[in-house]
């Protein structure tokens, strides 16, 4: 038993020396490490910002604060945003909104749009990088009633009849309907 412990300790010491030597050969220059840090910041910043926005917008009962409500529920705002509204950078002050955050952690979500009888509407869907990946509405899909299945990454289930599939790049999606 004692010889096995000694052999194990010697083996770890030798392996540690080998690993330490390998790490020393691959160390980064300060400029390269800084560049990697900047790239990581730029890549993850939108994800963090959108997640903070999501948590602030959905951790409340509907109707308590302008445009905010629980996950997986549209909150329709029946009045124009006030000039003091600062939840997003620049909302339109002459537009009525219906806003939803959807969580597809466990399953896809169905989003239904009514027949608007030729009236303009738009349902831009933003991923967690804040990129619009789909925008059902007057210009892209017409104004007749439609059902959309928003599928999370990797979802392979079957599509119900008459439902249009939209693949989301992230499991959380922000819909800013107008």
Which positions does each model-derived feature cover?
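Positively charged n-region of N-terminal signal peptides that target proteins for export
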Residues: 1-4
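Bacterial N-terminal signal peptides
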Residues: 7-17
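A compositional/structural signature for long, glycine/proline-rich flexible linkers
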Residues: 23-178
């Amino acid at each position: 038993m004692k010889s096995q412990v000694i052999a194990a300790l010697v083996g770890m010491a030798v392996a540690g020396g080998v690993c330490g030597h390998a790490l020393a050969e691959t160390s980064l220059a300060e400029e390269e490490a800084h560049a990697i840090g900047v790239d990581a910041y730029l890549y993850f910043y939108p994800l963090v910002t959108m997640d903070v926005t999501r948590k602030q917008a959905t951790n409340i009962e509907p109707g308590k604060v302008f445009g905010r409500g629980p996950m997986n529920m549209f909150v329709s705002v029946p009045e124009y945003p006030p000039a003091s509204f600062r939840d997003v950078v620049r909302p339109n002050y002459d537009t009525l909104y219906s806003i939803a955050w959807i969580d597809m952690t466990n399953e896809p979500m169905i989003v239904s749009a009514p027949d608007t009888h030729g009236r303009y509407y738009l349902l831009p869907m933003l991923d967690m990088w804040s990129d619009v990946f789909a925008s059902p509405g007057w210009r892209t899909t017409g104004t007749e009633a439609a059902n959309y299945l928003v599928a999370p990454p990797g979802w392979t289930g079957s599509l119900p009849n008459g439902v249009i599939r939209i693949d989301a790049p992230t499991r959380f999606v922000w819909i800013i309907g107008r």
